[in-house]
Regions:
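Active-site histidine-anchored catalytic micro-motif
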Residues: 2-13, 21-111, 231-253, 257, ...
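Hard-cation-handling environments
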Residues: 130-277
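Short, compositionally biased low-complexity segments
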Residues: 79-81, 113-121, 165-170, 193
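Short helix-terminating capping/connector loops at secondary-structure junctions
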Residues: 58-60, 116-119, 226-229
């Protein structure tokens, strides 16, 4: 785990650029990026590939990028692209919708129907992983604010990037992006409206965690009625394989043994143990 190696970065970039060059000429391009890629060569790998693609295709080609909600959206990405959209659900269930909307904005730009202008607000703000669920407050409120801004005349897209908090890069953190139709002042107002509300909720965005001991004790006290509905599930947010961790943490098992909790099942990555089975 860790940054993408220089060798892997150069290979991926060369393949992407080769395909762009071979398949052109282009009226527009859609880039399905994550937005938080970090390599030993480029701390902002997504921004860099956008820049290199722009250099290759020129200023007249409309470039759109659809990003993951955990993107650490950089000013470089916004500067090099004409349109950027971000997933607005966590867990991510609107990937298709956001990609379609990005494609629609790119197509309308090519046709001359709109003139997208973007503004990225990036206050010094980080949302704890425990508070990133978009069905729960305070993220649910921030999404309502963003959607209200999107409904204003002249707005083409307004949304939030939660950021990837485990990346040690300057771009790490929450971002607030707005796209207007040819109005840079409006784009800034839209993005700032969401960013300002997030700043007001900065304490709530930090969330509160439960210790391993407390979680196990609460789970161990589950009633027979509760257990009849299914097992108690504990999520170790510090070893989330969906976020790039190795999945080999034994802290929960150690604490379960210390407390005498029985009937615990945990998935672990341990190649040596697996080889002995």
């Amino acid at each position: 785990m860790g940054p993408i190696s220089v060798e892997a970065t150069e290979y991926l970039f060369s393949e992407i650029l080769r395909l762009v060059a071979e398949q052109g000429p282009w009226d527009g391009l859609l880039l399905p990026l994550h937005g938080a890629a970090v390599s030993d060569k480029y701390l902002d790998a997504d921004g860099e590939i956008c820049a290199q693609i722009r250099d290759l295709v020129g200023e007249d080609v409309v470039i759109g990028a659809s990003l993951d909600m955990h993107a650490n959206v950089s000013q470089k990405i916004v500067e090099e692209c004409d349109v950027v959209t971000i997933y607005q659900t966590n867990p991510h269930i609107d990937t298709y919708e956001q990609a379609v909307h990005c494609a629609d904005l790119v197509l309308r730009t090519i046709r001359g129907e709109i003139n997208p202008v973007m503004y990225l607000a990036d206050p010094p703000l980080l949302v704890n992983i425990l508070s990133q669920g978009t069905s729960d407050e305070p993220m649910a409120e921030l999404l309502r604010v963003a959607q209200a801004q999107w409904k204003k005349p002249g707005a083409l897209w307004v949304g939030i990037g939660e950021g990837y908090p485990y990346a040690d890069v300057p771009e790490m953190g929450m971002t607030f992006l707005a796209i207007s139709d040819g109005d840079p002042v409006l784009a800034k107002e839209l993005a700032d409206a969401v960013a300002n509300r997030a700043w007001e909720l900065r304490v709530e965005l930090q969330g509160s965690s439960t210790s391993v001991r407390d979680a196990l004790e609460r789970a161990n006290k589950a009633s027979a009625e509760q257990l009849a509905k299914g097992p108690v599930v504990l999520f170790d947010v510090g070893d989330n394989v969906g976020a790039g961790t190795p999945g080999d943490s034994t802290y929960v098992l150690h604490e379960a043994r210390a407390l005498g909790v029985r009937g615990v099942t945990q998935a672990l990555r341990d190649a040596d143990v697996a080889a002995q089975c």
